[in-house]
Amino acid sequence: MKRLKGVIILLILLFTACGVEKEKGKEKEIEKLEYKGATNSYKYNLVIPQILNLQSEDISYFNLSLQENARLIIDELLESTDELKQDIPYEAIVNYQIKENNFGIISIVLKIYLYTGGAHGNTTLETYNIGTKNLKLINFESFFNENAQSYFEMKINDAIENEKKVKNTNGEEVVFFENPEVNIKNAVMYFEGDNIKFVFPLYELAPYSSGMPVFEFSKDEIKKYMK
């Protein structure tokens, strides 16, 4: 019954608090879809992108999966507040950035913040890269050849071992764990300008206080590893 009540509330909130706003300029094909809601127990503000005027199976999947993920986040938030009594409202915030680049790729970075109790919330990044020619989603395997993984991991290990200055997503210097295990497949990637950037999640290579490390490679440097 509690779950049914949550679903009914969720549907009401979705239909009454969903707004649309079109991006301007070069981003005119990206539409903002916004979900907002708040009570004494929780609050959420989820802003997700929707790609318009371009049609492909991957773009349809992208649009629908982001809508479904937003609904799941809200559903879980409602269920959590039903199950527990908390002093501080639980919170969910989602927003995104479109990264302009010279790779012919629509590169979108989704930032997700969730607080469901404890000392602090948790932030994660999701990235979505779509080729502007074939309108297909791009991942590490589809973009790079078989030699790329070992190259990137070698370069990242070298930067850590030699204590080169690496910054996190907030532009602050990262202090790494001792001898962290680098797996490039655990990072998300996006394209910006003439560079590709890899972002590792919290706790993967460094403590929470150091945030999410960002490693950047230029197009010229990685050209021989691109398919």
Identify the residue ranges that each predicted region occupies.
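Sec-dependent signal peptide recognition
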Residues: 2-10
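C-terminal motif of bacterial Sec signal peptides marking the signal peptidase cleavage site
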Residues: 15-17
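Compositionally biased intrinsically disordered regions enriched in Thr/Gly
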Residues: 19-227
